Amino acid sequence: MSDQPFQFDAARFINTLTKNGHNRLIGAQYHAHGDDWCELAIPYNPELVSDSATGILASGPIFTLMDMATSLSIWLKTGTIQPQATLDLRIDYLRPAKPGQTVIGHGECYHITRSIAFIRGHAHDGDPEKPIAHVAGTYFLTAS
């Protein structure tokens, strides 16, 4: 038995989550994380385009990306992996993603009560100062 305490490898864990289900289908990938935030990326994929004439990415993959990034930010903030459910996730689309660009989703958990986590975030395609979308919402911590 090792004398080293268990250390949660968030990058490895998040990378594993993006290899399954709808996150795999949209091509979500780990990008970066901190104590209360997570970034995921979706490389440009013509199969996710909503209009073949323009090459603009559909809104659904961006919503999925933001739901996953904000959800993971809660686990990072609490330091525990616990069941949770999206109560409300509002997304304001500011502009379409540029065709051919990777979309980065940044999610942050900024407050937690006994049973509710509050999140915010944004998606961009290379410049965080020119976001594609902003998100805000709440998650129910189902184990509470």
Where are these regions (language model features)?
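Short, solvent-exposed helix-to-loop capping segments enriched in aromatics
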Residues: A10-N20, L72-I81
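Catalytic strand-loop segment that frames the active site of acyl-thioester-processing enzymes
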Residues: G27-L57
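Compact, glycine-rich, soluble single-domain proteins
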Residues: A53-S71
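Hydrophobic residues in beta-strands and at strand termini
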Residues: I42-Y44, Y93, L141
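HotDog/MaoC-like acyl-thioester-processing domains
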Residues: M1-F8, A97-I104, E108-S144
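A generic structural signal for short beta-strands and their flanking turns/coil linkers
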Residues: I26, D36-C38, P83-L89, Q101, ...
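N-terminal structural module
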Residues: F13-D35
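Hydrophobic beta-strand-centered segment that forms part of the acyl-chain substrate-binding groove
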Residues: S71-I104, C109
